[in-house]
Amino acid sequence: MTRLIFMGTPQFSATVLQGLLEKPAYDILAVVTQPDRAVGRKKDITMTPVKKLALAHQLPVFQPEKLSGSQELADIMALGADGIVTAAFGQFLPTVLLDSVTFAVNVHASLLPKYRGGAPIHYAIINGDKEAGVTIMEMVKEMDAGDMISSASLPILDTDNVGTMFDKLAILGRDLLLKTLPDYLSGDLKPVPQDHSQATFSPNLSAEEERLDWSKPAREVFNHIRGMNPWPVAHTLLDGQRFKIYEAELAEGSGSAGQIIAKTKKALVVAAGEGALSLTLVQPAGKPKMPIVDFLNGIGRSLEVGDVLGE
């Protein structure tokens, strides 16, 4: 039996952890995840999905604010694990920890060396990529630069957003890890170095990147909206206030960038630099998200063709 420390935070990670827990070949000694955080409009203190799953299986849980130099690090190393598996953990692993185990592998949600960093799925959708994937890789000190053990891909559909792709890639990553790990540990599967000259990066998105640029072609704005849903959510301005847009559809029509070019009781069409978008799920400032029909029957009733979003 291989003794493991698992490190991860969101539901993506919990899906991978669940797969390991169902395999008798692996003994999960402990789980390391991010601290509980205030979440949502009510700022409720919330456990990470990985912590919830770990507690359900009565596993020890460590939640260091910063792993390096912490007492938790010493306690984790004292467990004597054979290896570490990480998936969207959200922190760098200290070299001393990597050196203390026989192996350390990561389930990364991109086709490396493309999209190293913390937001690979967001960037894949925003950039209009036709496919996304996962890579099982060895952990090294440099971010997502380790040798690749295996990879798998799937298509990105127009109906996909970050949330749906996270769910799909979590399952893909779980299955790939469980398929790959035995051959890797036996030495039958040899890792392959990345071509570092081809590396691209996907750093966490800034607040400025959440704002839509209506001067871009409609397809790019459409991709941007999907690449921000369900978090951090793309927005524009409506009467000077933040107006979040969760979902939209490509539409025909033209006009000045951000201009409302059609309005009915059920639709609101906005021009982009080329083409247009019909908004379908929105969130006005201070309100919950709502279908466009509800918005147009309420506070959006006063909008008129010719009004401009983004100002």
Swiss-Prot record:
Q: Which residues bind (6S)-5,6,7,8-tetrahydrofolate?
A: S110, L111, L112, P113
Keyword Chaperone among record annotations: no
Q: Which GO terms describe its cellular component?
A: cytosol
Q: What class of enzyme is it?
A: transferase
For this protein, the record's Pfam families field holds:
Formyl_trans_C, Formyl_trans_N
Q: Key word Cell cycle present in the record? A: no
Q: Could you tell me which InterPro entries the record lists for this protein? A: Fmt, Formyl_trans_C, Formyl_trans_C_sf, Formyl_transf_N, Formyl_transf_N_sf, Formyl_transferase-like_C_sf, GART_AS, Met-tRNA-FMT_C
Q: Which domain of life is it from?
A: Bacteria
Keywords, sorted A to Z: Protein biosynthesis, Transferase
HAMAP family in the record: Formyl_trans
Under NCBIfam families, the record lists:
fmt
Record PANTHER family: METHIONYL-TRNA FORMYLTRANSFERASE, METHIONYL-TRNA FORMYLTRANSFERASE, MITOCHONDRIAL
Q: Which family would the database say this protein is a member of?
A: Belongs to the Fmt family.
Q: What name does the UniProt record give this protein?
A: Methionyl-tRNA formyltransferase
**Which organism is this entry from?**
Streptococcus equi subsp. equi (strain 4047)
